């Protein structure tokens, strides 16, 4: 740490600001996971009819009612407006800080750089059967109150920050209980369209996501294309739109366009492992093993994107291309290479059924050959 950093390091105070509605199933778990790191808890309730408020009162009396007006940003900005501490932390009711991440937050709180305007944290959003993190993205999670940063967007809102932004290795874990196909967000978008509102490039992209989630693939493709055509989307949304369009075309059994939009993702940035793995899987399915090997090998040699807010499928950046290379090399008779890649995959997921199966298979192959 240099002298300037030493002088600016100090203990900060934190307001936790949340918006809730009928969160009785998860709110207590969320607050227990983070309360010890906060100096103030602000809860804005948008119309709970369950026991949410009663549960929250165990942790704070700063509970404010806010009428639901189909605008998430308005509700979050209302929550932020009640904060009185130096920094604001925000969470959703189905998020938690795992014990290790709570300790990291407490350490950051004691040794924060007071010149930083916003800290990013990882957001772990999906997991495999073994509990390993599959998808993660970065969020501006802890922000200086005096900067008055604002939330933007009625749905799929984002916190617009500027100034000095530092990344952390703290993770917030999403632990959603029920993965339903709620129509709420889609309804908000369609009501806005019915009123004649012009959608921003970001709105076009997220409306397409809602259509995609509701299996309205043709219309989703239309709006993804509109988003791309603006040439104004965030690069990560452009890349994601390409992948989601490829998924839509796959659902429509259109392999030509599926490949077209997979390749198109490369025009927005250096290739991403997720898309290389898509291509590897495509050629593996066609038993074109050399082409599959090319794409999986490229995946394992890529550098992760530098943007801390980029969404990553961790499997594609770690074990998945290796286990697929194992399959490819095995099919062309390169057993030693297959074993090597299986071992690398095993270092990431030692108890995965595919790893265990492969170990047994290769033991038999080597035994037979000897």
Outline where the language-model segments fall.
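A conserved acidic beta->alpha catalytic loop
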Residues: 33, 37, 45-55, 68, ...
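Catalytic-site signature of metal-activated, phosphate-bearing donor transferases
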Residues: 2-5, 13, 74-80, 86, ...
């Amino acid at each position: 740490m240099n002298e300037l950093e030493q002088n600016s390091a100090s203990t900060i105070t934190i307001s936790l600001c949340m918006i809730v509605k009928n969160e009785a199933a998860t709110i207590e778990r969320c607050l227990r996971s983070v309360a010890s790191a906060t100096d103030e808890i602000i809860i804005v309730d948008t119309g709970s009819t369950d026991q949410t408020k009663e549960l929250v009162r165990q942790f704070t009396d700063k509970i404010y009612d806010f009428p639901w007006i189909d605008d998430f940003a308005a509700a979050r900005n209302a929550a932020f407006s009640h904060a009185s501490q130096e920094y604001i932390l925000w969470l959703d009711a189905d998020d938690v800080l795992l014990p290790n991440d709570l300790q990291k937050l407490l350490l950051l709180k004691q040794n924060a750089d007071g010149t930083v305007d916003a800290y990013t944290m990882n957001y772990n959003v999906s997991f495999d059967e073994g509990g390993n993190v599959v998808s993660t993205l970065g969020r501006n999670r802890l922000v200086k109150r005096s900067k008055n940063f604002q939330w933007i967007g009625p749905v799929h809102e984002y916190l617009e920050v500027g100034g000095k932004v530092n990344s952390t290795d703290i993770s917030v874990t999403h632990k959603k209980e029920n993965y339903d196909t709620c129509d709420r967000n889609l309804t908000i978008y369609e009501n806005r369209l019915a009123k004649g509102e012009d959608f921003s490039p970001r709105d076009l992209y997220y409306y397409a996501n809602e259509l995609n989630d509701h299996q309205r693939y043709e219309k989703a493709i239309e709006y993804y294309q509109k988003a791309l055509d603006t040439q104004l989307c965030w690069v990560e949304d452009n890349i994601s739109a390409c992948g989601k369009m490829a998924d839509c075309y796959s659902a429509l059994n259109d392999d030509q366009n599926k490949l077209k939009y997979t390749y198109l993702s490369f025009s927005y940035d250096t290739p991403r492992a997720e898309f290389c793995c898509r291509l590897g899987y495509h050629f593996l399915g066609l038993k074109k093993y050399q082409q599959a090997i090319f794409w999986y090998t490229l995946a394992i040699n890529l550098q992760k994107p530098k943007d801390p807010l980029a969404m990553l499928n961790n499997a594609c950046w770690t074990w998945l291309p290796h286990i697929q290379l194992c399959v490819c090399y095995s099919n062309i008779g390169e057993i030693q290479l297959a074993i090597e890649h299986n071992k690398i995959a095993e270092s990431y997921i030692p108890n995965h059924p595919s790893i265990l199966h492969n170990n047994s298979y290769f033991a038999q192959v080597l035994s037979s050959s000897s």
